[in-house]
């Protein structure tokens, strides 16, 4: 059975194409700075938003019309696998990602849940034999079920801690079996609503203990995927322990985990934390902690996680600038943790949305590489910080001075001349590059 009978293979047709089922800018075979676009971008499909999302909201029921929704239970899970691999093949993406409950329903017991997972994992593994699509990462959903009301690894209930560990243990086994290149930890409920009833130190210490156990078990079974933490400041909890990259990095350092983890950075989560996407990418990059990306965008007018498909070319350009400066994402990728809008409820909309996102990052890639080749931003930054390349500034950078010498230098100064930041000029130049890239 075909779940998308009206859709053929999605291919690159160029900017002048009016075919909605074609890439306008993403040409997977096009060479950009020695690598193909496909090698640079490493796109991934989010199983949950694409194949399980009902498009409901707090004010209304789901609107999604999906041919596989005629089934229920394990039959539905199997139909979703069939639909997923048809979708992967037609849009030609190299990777996909999932939570455990995305691919198989929870049973009435943990043992039954394991059995359901075993059936679907075997089916996915069989499909992967004839597919070019691989598993970028998998993870455990330790936030949806009511048992996680007080958290998972940070729960006030030791039984919930144990249950969460069992799910991650199974997830690591699945990751190894399916060849996952990474394993993600998103602490959806690892946080608190009120300090009045929270043992903050115990919860954070337990979270650290949990991560160490995960590292140990991965080594025990020979799972060599990269561990990734996905920061988010709030929602569903009021304050989450992995607020942003800086907070997460401090946590990892405090618990001696910084050599075992990197970060999976989501654009919309950066927005919720009061940061730009590129800020979070830059902070991770300069600390050698940039592992993977959840490619989406948020609505700056709203205060929650809208998970829109990325179409902001300014954002994709600055994101790709950071990724290119990082030397790529290594084993990571660009996972579309994004859902179509509630009014875009037909199955074809899934293709339109992913095409838009892939084209947007293709544009961002080419513009970012041109900015790097021409040293546009580097020239402005080098000029702005010129004072640290000579004189007292160079002595500061080299660690060859102290407060006594700096005071003596300051006393010898007249009026200090400062330099313009030229930020408006820089933004105008970026606009030029965006407009000229495909002119």
Curated annotation (Swiss-Prot):
Record's subcellular location: Cytoplasm
One GO cellular component term noted in the UniProt record for this chain: cytoplasm
Textual note on the cofactor: Binds 2 magnesium ions per subunit.
Catalytic activity: alpha-D-xylose = alpha-D-xylulofuranose
InterPro entries the record matches: Xyl_isomerase-like_sf, Xylose_isom_bac, Xylose_isomerase
GO BP terms, alphabetized: D-xylose metabolic process
Alphabetical UniProt keywords: Carbohydrate metabolism, Cytoplasm, Isomerase, Magnesium, Metal-binding, Xylose metabolism
Similarity comment text for this entry: Belongs to the xylose isomerase family.
Name used for this protein in its record: Xylose isomerase
Organism listed in the record: Shouchella clausii (strain KSM-K16)
Lineage: Bacteria, Bacillati, Bacillota, Bacilli, Bacillales
Gene encoding the protein: xylA
